[in-house]
A protein has these predicted regions:
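Gram-negative bacterial Sec-dependent N-terminal signal peptides
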Residues: 1-30
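Active-site-adjacent core segments of small-molecule enzymes
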Residues: 30-512
């Protein structure tokens, strides 16, 4: 009797299980786990073994594939600007700039252009605390009707150096030592003691501007001069400036210590949370312009990346709103490839020596990180058709069907004369020499005197914290002489803060 009941129960249970499975299949089929080739996975919890105590078998494709893919999840880290966060948005032109440029985003008032912005730290590694003192990258990709335009700048208006040939050395000095992997002020101040042009940027970085409280509450600067070209071929030099509608908010040293002890990713978290709440940050874009004939009107070189155009009026040309965060960090923020080489008709690089190097370097490093076909990735893909004969290479998923992969040919694929490079009149000789009107210290002094009393004190304390660690007396006093040359109060206070010899500082400064 018991046996009969058990068999009956078993049959009922099997019938019920089969019915349940049949009912469930249409619901779960769409979420079935698969291998990379699309084939179903039968067991993702246990490896295939030779019996209970035997070795794992090499034929376990699911195990091997998971381990292989896991070992290849990381692409090369950016040499600079490694840690970052990004957001989607829109730029709206506030006026047409036909008199200045044929660039698509400025073709008419009210014109909307989709953008992606990547904020970043410059020197520190991908997993570093966001509260560390560092310039912040502020790079914007415009998806325009004429192709992608990348405006790759920072949250500070100038840079440490003016010639790209010094860029690798500068970064090496700022990065951790190759011996012990520790970032060392002895190293980077040694380098900067030979680069008096860095005084202006160091004054910015060691002020509270070097530790922003929020990505939403900092400005962005193009840093370099660019060129704008109108339909007549007329050229104007231009500088770009993003002005935060949220205002500016920085952290002092005490606030930095408090924030870092609580949240080492406060900048990223703030951006995600605020945009998630619908508090969309906005920046107004301003430009300054100079006629080529005005370049000699200043006591400095306007194409020097260590300088600001202090006496040139700004004009508002549009507003950017960030309104959507990426749904996948890697696919968007990590794979986005910003490069000053990505320009469109109506905008060109100037003769700024640092920018000239960046035009090559940034595009090249993106090819190294992401491959030759990185511009086919969704985050980098232009909204317009890409028509050229660049072909093949790793991860190329284009579809070349024509027998003609060259130009010119009988096929009707031609150039657009409006996109030709503007003409620049040259004079002089091919040379290898520094620029003439360097003025290494004046603008650093203007900046220092423009700070409030508390901002000056914070700057001195921040600088003394690192400069006071420098063991080489010559290096320390050369640096002190640079700051003294910028402003006597600046240099005197800093010398006292690091127990320097003011008499020696004055002697060194007199020779600058």
């Amino acid at each position: 009797m018991n046996t009969q009941l058990n068999n009956t129960n078993k049959k009922s249970l099997l019938t019920l299980s089969a019915l349940t499975l049949a009912m469930a299949l249409p619901v779960t089929a769409a979420t079935m786990l698969t291998k990379d080739n699309g084939a179903a996975v039968g067991d993702n919890q246990n490896s295939i073994t030779a019996g209970e105590r035997g070795s794992v078998l090499l034929e376990d494709v699911q195990l091997i594939q998971k381990l292989q893919r896991f070992a290849r999840e990381r692409i090369p880290e950016r040499v600079v600007h490694a840690r970052g966060t990004g957001a989607h948005g829109v730029f709206v032109a506030s006026k047409e700039l036909d008199d200045l440029t044929i660039a698509a985003p400025f073709s008419e008032a009210g014109k909307e252009t989709e953008v992606f912005v990547r904020f970043s730290s410059v020197i520190h590694s991908k997993g570093s605390p966001e509260s560390l003192r560092d310039p912040r990258g502020f790079a914007t990709k415009f998806y325009t009707d004429e192709g992608n335009w990348d405006l790759v700048g920072n949250n500070l208006p100038v840079f440490f150096i003016r010639d790209a040939i010094k860029f690798p050395d500068m970064v090496h000095s700022l990065k951790p030592s190759p011996v012990d992997n520790i970032q060392d002020p002895n190293r980077f101040f040694d380098f900067f003691s030979y680069e008096p042009g860095s005084t202006h940027m160091l004054t910015w970085v060691y002020s509270d501007y070097g530790t922003p409280a929020s990505l939403r509450k900092m400005d962005g600067w193009g840093v370099h001069a660019y060129k704008m070209i109108n339909k007549s071929g007329d050229v104007k030099y231009v500088k770009f400036h993003w002005v935060s509608q949220q205002g500016i908010d920085n952290l002092d040293a005490k606030q930095v210590a408090k924030v870092q002890s609580q949240d080492f990713q406060h900048l990223t978290r703030d951006l995600y949370e605020e945009i998630g709440k619908g508090n969309f940050p906005k920046w107004d874009l301003y430009i300054k312009t100079l006629d080529p004939s005005q370049l000699d009107d200043f006591d400095y070189n306007p194409l020097d990346a260590t300088k600001m155009w202090l006496d040139v009026k700004e004009t508002k040309v549009g507003t950017m709103t960030l309104n959507r965060m990426p749904t996948n960090f890697f696919q968007s923020t990590e794979q986005v490839a910003m490069a000053p080489a990505n320009i469109i008709p109506g905008i060109e690089p100037s003769e700024d020596r640092l920018l000239q190097g960046r035009v090559f370097s940034y595009a090249d490093t993106q090819m190294y990180r992401l491959g030759a076909n990185h511009q086919q990735l969704p985050i980098n893909r232009a909204k317009v058709d890409v028509v050229n004969y660049n072909q093949d290479g790793a991860m190329n998923y284009g579809n070349t069907t024509s027998n003609v992969n060259y130009q010119p040919s009988h096929e009707n694929v031609s150039e657009n004369p409006i996109a030709r490079r503007s003409q620049t009149q040259l004079k002089g000789y091919v040379q290898q020499a520094a620029i003439k009107k360097q003025q290494n210290f004046a603008q650093a002094g203007v900046l220092y005197r423009g700070f409030s009393k508390q901002e000056r004190t914070n700057l001195i304390n921040n600088l003394a914290g690192d400069l006071g660690k420098v063991q080489n007396s010559d290096v320390k006093h050369k640096m002190l002489s640079h700051f003294y040359k910028a402003d006597t109060e600046y240099g005197t206070r800093l010398t006292k803060a690091v127990n320097g010899d003011l008499k020696m500082v004055k002697q060194l400064a007199s020779k600058l």
